[in-house]
UniProtKB/Swiss-Prot annotation:
Sorted UniProt keywords: Cytoplasm, Methyltransferase, rRNA processing, S-adenosyl-L-methionine, Transferase
Role this protein plays: Specifically methylates the N7 position of a guanine in 16S rRNA.
Binding site for S-adenosyl-L-methionine: G79, F84, A130, E131, R149
One Gene Ontology cellular component: cytosol
Organism, as annotated: Pelotomaculum thermopropionicum (strain DSM 13744 / JCM 10971 / SI)
Taxonomic lineage from the root: Bacteria, Bacillati, Bacillota, Clostridia, Eubacteriales
HAMAP family registered for this protein in UniProt: 16SrRNA_methyltr_G
Protein name as it appears in the record: Ribosomal RNA small subunit methyltransferase G
Compartment(s) where it occurs, according to its Swiss-Prot or TrEMBL record: Cytoplasm
Length: 239
């Protein structure tokens, strides 16, 4: 058994996640593809099997602590990069419909290759800016859960993500130990965009004990038509 497979199995067990042999094989295939394409695409600075298993794959699966992702749930992953957390979540919840949004064309091409190589059905990579996706009627307020692992401030991520979440759905921001401080700064933005802070779940990654926070924001009203603002504005002038 590979180090990657062993780490994923043990970590998933510790997290209370049931994982099949097929899913473990998909994670191994995904890892191989990441390493294969990493030199040309700069997908990740972390390349060791155990590190990738913990800091990318298991870290992505922490989302299940906040949102169980029941059969048929529609999930959008904004600023997904190499596919985190969307692809690991899709592997473990194959019945979920997943859209992976990535603004870098080469990474979007990689995501399409990964979806094909792993045999993931009801999964699609979208090459676009988050601000444009949030305005698109095909995506606006269409998702049960919108997730982001990006490093932007929560107020910025809220403008990227909340417009795509349907009323009653949620926006899940994956953050580090300073999530509470960011939530305070993002309070007005969340309210303006139709959201309400529901909870902040603090947890630790298996094996490393690294601290993570999941910020759960419930969509309680429609996002005003003028949001998101044009590409680049949310980052320059957060709400």
């Amino acid at each position: 058994m590979s180090v990657l497979a062993e780490t994923i199995k043990e970590g998933a067990r510790e997290m209370g996640i049931v994982i099949t042999e097929k899913q473990v094989r998909q994670f191994e295939e995904y890892y191989s593809l990441i390493i294969e394409r990493n030199k040309s695409l700069n997908l990740t600075a972390i390349t060791g099997e155990r590190e990738v298993a913990v800091k990318h794959f298991l870290d992505s699966l922490t989302c299940l602590k906040a949102v169980p992702l029941e059969d048929g749930t529609s999930l959008m992953d904004v600023g997904t990069g190499a596919g985190f957390p969307g692809i690991p979540l899709k592997i473990c919840r194959p019945s979920v419909r997943v859209k992976l949004v990535e603004s870098a064309e080469k990474k979007a091409v990689f995501l399409r290759e990964a979806i094909g190589r792993l045999g993931l059905e009801m999964a699609e990579a979208i090459w676009a800016r988050a601000e444009d996706v949030g305005k698109d009627p095909d995506h606006r307020e269409k998702y049960g859960c919108v997730v982001a692992r990006a490093v932007a401030e929560l107020a910025v991520l809220a403008e990227y993500c909340l417009p795509a979440a349907g009323v009653g759905g949620c926006f899940l921001a994956m953050k580090g130990p300073k999530a509470e401080e960011e939530a305070v700064r993002a309070k007005d933005a969340i309210k303006i965009l139709g959201g309400r802070l529901e909870e902040i779940i603090n947890l630790k990654l298996p094996f490393t004990g690294d601290r993570r926070s999941l910020v759960v924001i419930r969509k309680i009203g429609e996002t005003p038509e003028k949001y998101p603002r044009r590409p680049g504005v949310p980052q320059k002038r957060p709400l």
